[in-house]
């Protein structure tokens, strides 16, 4: 059996201080730290606007909705993934198409992906196992 190591989070005193500062400010979600982070991300990406959401799940669903993906559409994702990769496809009314992984990498098989693409395929949600 091939074991996949997961690394512990890299949290330094600087991150702990930032979290404490945010908590002491009384703002947890939509406060000045969030607005500043959105501004910096937008600048980094070379765009005027960015928005923070509470999870990657929310981001995936919003992306599918912005792309206009819904009933009658197919979205391909990995069969080896967290539930969010597939559940967001169902939330927008599209049909999930699950692709098996390569045995050595546990990433979506490109050969299987190519075979699964149809005229109804509107997006692919790749999965980076282990982050």
Describe each model-derived feature in a short phrase.
Residues 15-18, 37, 84:
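Hydrophobic alpha-helical segments typical of transmembrane helices
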Residues 65-129:
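PLP-dependent aminotransferase-like
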Residues 13, 35, 107-110:
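Structural motif corresponding to alpha-helix initiation and N-cap regions
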Residues 27-74, 88-92, 97-100:
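Phosphate-binding glycine-rich loop
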Residues 11, 32, 36, 54-55, ...:
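Short beta->alpha linker loops
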Residues 1-28, 32:
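N-terminal "arm"/small-domain region of PLP-dependent enzymes with the aminotransferase-like
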């Amino acid at each position: 059996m091939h074991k996949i190591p997961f690394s512990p989070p890299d949290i330094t005193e600087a991150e702990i201080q930032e979290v404490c500062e945010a908590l002491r400010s009384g703002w947890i979600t939509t406060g000045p730290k969030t607005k500043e982070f959105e501004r910096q991300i937008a600048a980094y990406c070379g765009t005027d606007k960015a928005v923070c959401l509470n999870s990657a799940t929310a981001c995936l669903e919003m992306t599918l909705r912005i792309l206009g993906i819904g009933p009658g559409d197919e979205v391909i994702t990995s069969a080896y993934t967290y539930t969010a990769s597939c559940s967001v496809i169902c939330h927008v009314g599209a049909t999930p198409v699950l692709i098996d992984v390569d045995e050595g990498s546990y990433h979506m098989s490109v050969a299987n992906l190519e075979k699964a693409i149809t005229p109804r395929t509107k997006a692919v949600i790749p999965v980076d196992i282990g982050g």
